[in-house]
Amino acid sequence: MTVSGTGKVTLTPDIAYVTIGVHTEGKDASQAVSENNSQTQAVIEALEKSDIASEDIQTTNFSIYPQQQFDDRGQPTGEITYIVNNSVYITVRDLESIGDVLNVAVEAGANQISGIQFDISDAEDALAEAQEMAVANAQAQAENLAQASNLVLGDIQNISTFGGATPYLKYDGIGGGAAVMEAASVPVSSGQMIISVEVSVIYEIR
């Protein structure tokens, strides 16, 4: 007999990843780069003062490219503007401070924030619990089927997992159990994460 079982464990995220960027423009490439460098350095220093460790700040993108300017009729003016982008990827280990961290970054010169991702720093215990629940769920189904069919359930012959055990977010929204940081900071909701495990179990029938 082959049955499947599912186990789910709901957790509150305790870590976040955010991409913070500085975008500058200028008619002179070196000037645009210099301005961007100054703003980016100010952002990094502000983040470090907000208890973001230096090892949790990583530059992920730096780009500079020319952009043609156009007039009201859509015709090129011959003027060139240089676009400079610099992005850093940060890890926030205190979710209660994430709103303040974003505020600090913006006040220091950041003008691009994207890709806020929440995660669980240590999900091993939750994964083990979800696996136990999945096996117990499969066991219960097998016992019910055996009883309904007047069969005797034997030993487990094989257990396999499928569907993965990747945590995924479940947004409950404000007031629905989600961690929300408001006050004077940017309001950010971490929601909840669900670790889901599915198993397939083969039983001997006697």
Feature locations, PLM:
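Short, charge-dense linear interaction motifs
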Residues: 1-108, 112-206
